[in-house]
């Protein structure tokens, strides 16, 4: 499937999506540009699908796309993904996130969007 390069090379694009995906799991909603939100939506749906399987292999696959940092004293990003979010979408077959268009950014009028878990 085609994807947006987001005006970056491969390593920069992977780092950007990794950071955005980690922030989305921690905050459950972020504001970013529309093109970044659309790319992040593809990755987020894949991460939830991996988390629903819940095996060690899928945990390691998901860890490749996330920073496993602490959210609070007892929870990390991977734990939140595999425990809270996976159980929340256990009966859903897809469409775990939604992209809502908002007003353009003030400085350069870039199209902005809110991406959140549905």
UniProtKB/Swiss-Prot annotation:
Listed name of the protein: Large ribosomal subunit protein bL17
GO cellular component assignments: large ribosomal subunit
Family label: Belongs to the bacterial ribosomal protein bL17 family.
Swiss-Prot/TrEMBL keywords: Ribonucleoprotein, Ribosomal protein
Domain of life: Bacteria
Coiled coil: none
Name of the gene this protein is made from: rplQ
One MF term in the entry's GO annotations: structural constituent of ribosome
SUPFAM superfamilies: Prokaryotic ribosomal protein L17
GO biological-process terms attached to the record: translation
InterPro entries associated with the record: Ribosomal_bL17, Ribosomal_bL17_CS, Ribosomal_bL17_sf
Quaternary organization: Part of the 50S ribosomal subunit. Contacts protein L32.
